[in-house]
């Protein structure tokens, strides 16, 4: 779809309360994927679109739960849905489904065959929970270990202490991805994943090939490296959500959930723009 005046009019957000609010097209993508109300008991009265808008506002602005604006549903209600969907792994499932839809939209197979792996160390706060010191980045906190496909769509994220080396955290991440994307075989990586340790850890987990893309010894200053720029761009996309500027969460489950929310935000906007014409 061409990004012309008609498309701009369809996707403009000036009528929304906040820039993070979903458009009608984005909600049409997300709504069928949310769980229905439970049978029996008190009928559901809350508007799930308002709940999703509140969660996206939290992700985009990075504000505290207590600072959630009053025109959203009550804070306790929004928190309840966020944690319930975290515990049921709904955020992970939504990201998975939207990735496959976006890939098919681009004319690709739903399950990728190649991906790019990297990690991002971020500081934690006094909230507690698992953390560690990344001596290379000089950061005390956690690592977000991600693998996007070659389009830059985040396939999965694994959060762990920052003192876990990349090659030690990679096997668990790749095993989790293989379960969800069974055709994934080839991984592009930087020098932090070089050596036999990672390859030995992946034995018995499928037919993996790890391609190390190193920076040239003669290069001076900034250099765009083939394939590796894809994962750096994905991390930059996720970084548009200020909730991810630091790791504010006590549990790694919540940390992972917010990363998936950021991915869902990107994917729903992408699909709404190109896949659902009026």
Stretch-by-stretch model annotation:
Residues 1-278:
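Short alpha-helical elements
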